[in-house]
Amino acid sequence: MRVLGIESSCDETGVAVFDSQLGLLGHELYSQVAVHAEYGGVVPELASRDHIRKLIPLVDDILSSTHSVGAIDAVAYTAGPGLIGALLVGSCVGRAMAYAWGVPAIGVHHMEGHLLAPLLEAEPPEFPFVALLVSGGHTQLVDVKAIGDYMLLGESLDDAAGEAFDKAAKMMDLDYPGGPQVARFAEKGQPGRFKFPRPMTDRPGLDFSFSGLKTFTLNTVNEHAQANGLPDDQTCADICHAFQEAVVDTLVIKCRRALQQTGRKTLIIAGGVSANNRLREKLEQALAKIGARVYYARHEFCTDNGAMIAFAGCQRLIAGQTADLSVDVFPRWPLESLDAIQTSHASNPRTTLDNL
């Protein structure tokens, strides 16, 4: 089965073609960072309009480059969660193409796409495992027994980790998008100059909270400004270092705790924040001490992309799940509400990815 995947949940327009026998044939991604940079964040109306402008040309390009014109067996598109206008663009285009081609279509859960992205790698993890989904909109720990068989272990009670990164960047007037900027500044930071708390790590449970850390960061910036004027680059770097260490340590502590509570020996991390090199480094160190292993997707598949949607959609379509022609999208959609499918249906994604 050859599946066209469409991702349009927020500010990236992604398309890909995945073949159940040959693997990932190709993917293309258009980022709207330049569109939203002057506003310091995503403007939903602008995001929707830009998806309309870019999606069909991207589909044309990917069908041509993968020699898939007339060869698509199904269309998978992101149905949620996300920005409703952006979701509707991808849903309408995906369903229209499926109808015109006479092939099935299916709406894919955006976070299931992220969760399964590490399976696109040459050495994918085996079920069962614990997943840390960490992005601008989500911070969740999930016990994964099979595709679709998910149990929520813990989640953020307020801000997501990625959102906290972005807000911290704004406080220091760093460029948009903020998360990567904080990570870059943190590399030059002096350890120990500022000490930040590790929220909710001193109590049992697997939930997160980052709103207090965000407030702590704001107070640190303001206190320094009152005493010494606006922070210079080195002070910003020192604050970024302390902030990033606090977030990373919190995530690592909870991940290790989740593995110990479930008895799992495998962790996957997915979502935009999973690209953070410091998080990867500290997770590998911590898990090695307990005989566990961490997997993640390559950096290009950590952010939103069409490849993860094509792959996730392919698994569900092979299992016989399709959608009707009604255009349903879900800005809010609990991951654990998805139906499980048999892992024996899962196709091998490895064959062509490393040749892209």
From Swiss-Prot:
GO cellular component: cytoplasm
InterPro entries in alphabetical order: ATPase_NBD, Gcp-like_dom, KAE1/TsaD, Peptidase_M22_CS, TsaD
Family: Belongs to the KAE1 / TsaD family.
Cofactor(s), by name: Fe(2+)
Keyword Nucleotide-binding applies: no
HAMAP family referenced in this protein's UniProt entry, alphabetically: TsaD
Cross-referenced Gene3D superfamilies: 3.30.420.40
Assigned keywords, A-Z: Acyltransferase, Cytoplasm, Iron, Metal-binding, Transferase, tRNA processing
Biological source species: Teredinibacter turnerae (strain ATCC 39867 / T7901)
Gene of this entry: tsaD
Reaction catalyzed: L-threonylcarbamoyladenylate + adenosine(37) in tRNA = N(6)-L-threonylcarbamoyladenosine(37) in tRNA + AMP + H(+)
Function per UniProt: Required for the formation of a threonylcarbamoyl group on adenosine at position 37 (t(6)A37) in tRNAs that read codons beginning with adenine. Is involved in the transfer of the threonylcarbamoyl moiety of threonylcarbamoyl-AMP (TC-AMP) to the N6 group of A37, together with TsaE and TsaB. TsaD likely plays a direct catalytic role in this reaction.
Name this protein carries in UniProt: tRNA N6-adenosine threonylcarbamoyltransferase
Cofactor binding description: Binds 1 Fe(2+) ion per subunit.
Main location group: cytoplasm
Subcellular location field: Cytoplasm
SUPFAM superfamilies: Actin-like ATPase domain
Binding of Fe cation, residues: H110, H114, D304
EC identifiers of the protein: 2.3.1.234
UniProt GO MF annotations: iron ion binding; N(6)-L-threonylcarbamoyladenine synthase activity
Sequence positions that bind substrate: L133, V134, S135, G136, G137, D166, G179, N276
Biological process according to GO: tRNA threonylcarbamoyladenosine modification
